[in-house]
């Protein structure tokens, strides 16, 4: 029995953080600042909206909301 538990899809209201390895390898990283703040990688951020393969994230800080690819996000577990 090697059936694994299916991964729960990220949706509006999910708490997430950015997976640093996936982000650094992405084309979005080439077009952005290479020195992102640590809170992006530590989390939690809340998904406000999902459109196609992107999610809009709001951090618990006084900073603008940001769009990331869903494949660059991981669920935040406390």
UniProtKB/Swiss-Prot annotation:
Regions that span the bilayer: none
EC number: 7.1.1.-
Keywords per UniProt: Membrane, NAD, NADP, Plastoquinone, Quinone, Thylakoid, Translocase, Transport
GO cellular component, one term: plasma membrane-derived thylakoid membrane
Domain of life: Bacteria
Localization in the cell: Cellular thylakoid membrane
Chemical reaction(s) catalysed: a plastoquinone + NADH + (n+1) H(+)(in) = a plastoquinol + NAD(+) + n H(+)(out); a plastoquinone + NADPH + (n+1) H(+)(in) = a plastoquinol + NADP(+) + n H(+)(out)
Xref: Pfam families: NdhO (PF11910)
Transport keyword on record: yes
Name of the molecule in the record: NAD(P)H-quinone oxidoreductase subunit O
Encoding gene, per UniProt annotation: ndhO
């Amino acid at each position: 029995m090697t059936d694994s538990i299916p991964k729960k899809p990220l949706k509006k209201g999910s708490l997430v953080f950015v997976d640093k390895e996936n982000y650094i390898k992405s084309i979005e990283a080439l077009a952005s600042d290479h020195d992102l703040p640590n809170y992006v990688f530590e989390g939690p951020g809340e998904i406000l909206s999902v459109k196609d393969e992107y999610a809009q994230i709001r951090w618990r800080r006084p900073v603008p909301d940001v769009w990331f690819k869903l494949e660059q996000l991981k669920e935040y577990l406390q």
